[in-house]
Design a protein with these regions (language model features):
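Nuclease-adjacent, charged terminal/linker segments that flank catalytic cores
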Residues: 1-58, 240-322
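Low-complexity, highly charged intrinsically disordered N-terminal segments
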Residues: 35-41, 65-74
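A short, highly charged nucleic-acid-interacting micro-segment common to nuclease
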Residues: 67-93
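Catalytic micro-motifs at enzyme active sites that drive phosphoryl/nucleotidyl and oxygen chemistry
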Residues: 79, 88, 110-129
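A short acidic/basic microdomain associated with nuclease active sites
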Residues: 94-118
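Conserved catalytic cores of phosphodiester-cleaving nucleases, focusing on short active-site segments
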Residues: 124-147
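Catalytic cores of nucleic-acid endonucleases
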Residues: 142-204
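C-terminal amphipathic alpha-helical segment
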Residues: 185-257
């Protein structure tokens, strides 16, 4: 399966789906430093700022921003790398109904080098999980400034040959590359689905997988409680809690004189039971309660809540604009 979007398929998305992908594909400092849950909010906002500074919308299409021409080569490469991560996550969610998407580097960073085993083969960058079908998928992302066939081939070879994930054949083994069209500056992508391999097996713990996925998101709530201990977390939807995040800049509206209302704000929501697991893991949930059992018991129905200013993923994480 391979297609450039401009000739075969146009994938439509909105800013809330993009925010969800930015939050759940990994944080910048996760790749260069140990866990530091005093900086989760800054990490998330910095990722949003990077995307806003790199992309513009023109006639409904995402284009490369002219301001990127003032960046040096290394800065452009970093931006392209993160765009590859973010949009691979977005494509997996929209086109392949992947509910959970995690960078495999985090296993070693948090749980040690034996937490994820790939039979001596270099592991793919991402592993995905679909809750309803209980199926795994593997992904390799690469982000480039221009079309780079060799980079796509390298990503394809990274997922090629994987026989199983936790003793199950992967539903997909996909290499994805994002890049900017040299003629119009449009953001485009190519995806290739590799055949099932015969040798390498990926083995890791599902409980650790889910813990890594939700942990940094719940740490945003911890930060919010430390900043505003009494009124920062509210119950907007039954079974969920949400916090308010303030982005850089203002909503420019000359008629609005209220400084608070002009601020760019959005709400992030998480199921109460998942927050409770991380905050009271050995309290009311008991020592035998697992995150896996909590996630499997969640009755998430995103279609019930979807509105123009609201988006909920199948992982139960939602954003709403206020």
């Amino acid at each position: 399966m391979e297609w450039p979007f401009y000739s075969s398929q146009i994938i439509e998305t909105n800013n809330l789906e993009l925010l969800h992908a930015i939050l759940t594909c990994g944080m910048p400092n996760q790749f260069v430093s140990p866990w530091h849950h005093e900086k989760r909010t800054q990490e998330f906002i910095s990722k949003i700022s990077m995307v806003e500074n790199t992309l513009i919308v023109n006639d409904g299409y995402l284009l490369k921003s002219p301001t990127t021409e003032f960046l040096d080569a290394s800065e452009k490469s970093v931006n392209s790398y993160y765009l590859g991560l973010i949009f691979t996550k977005l494509f997996s969610m929209k086109e392949f109904q992947v509910d959970y998407f995690l960078h495999t580097t985090l296993f070693e960073q948090v749980y040690g080098k034996d937490a994820l085993i790939c039979n001596g083969r270099k592991k793919p960058a991402f592993v995905g999980y679909q809750k309803e079908s209980k199926s795994w998928s593997i992904w390799e992302s690469t982000g480039k400034r221009d079309m780079a066939p060799k980079a796509l081939d390298d990503a394809y070879n990274q997922v090629l040959g994987i026989k199983s994930v936790n003793d199950e054949s992967p539903e997909y083994a996909i290499a994805c590359m994002t890049y900017f069209d040299t003629k119009h500056g449009e953001l485009q992508g190519i995806m290739r689905n590799a055949s099932v391999g015969k040798k390498a097996n990926m083995i890791f713990d599902k409980e650790q997988f889910l813990n890594l996925y939700y942990r940094h998101i719940c740490e945003l709530f911890d930060e919010s409680l430390r900043r505003k201990p009494f009124d920062s977390v509210i119950d907007y939807i039954d079974g969920y809690l949400e916090i308010e995040l303030e982005l850089f800049g203002l909503n420019v509206d000359a008629s609005d004189k209220d400084d608070y209302l002009r601020r760019r704000r959005l709400k992030l929501g998480v199921p109460k039971d998942i927050l409770g697991f991380f905050q009271y893991n050995h309290g009311r949930y008991g020592n035998n309660q697992t995150l896996t059992s909590i996630v499997e018991a969640l009755d998430v129905n995103p279609a019930e809540y979807q509105e123009d200013n609201f988006f909920m993923g199948r992982d139960g994480i939602y954003f709403r604009i206020i």
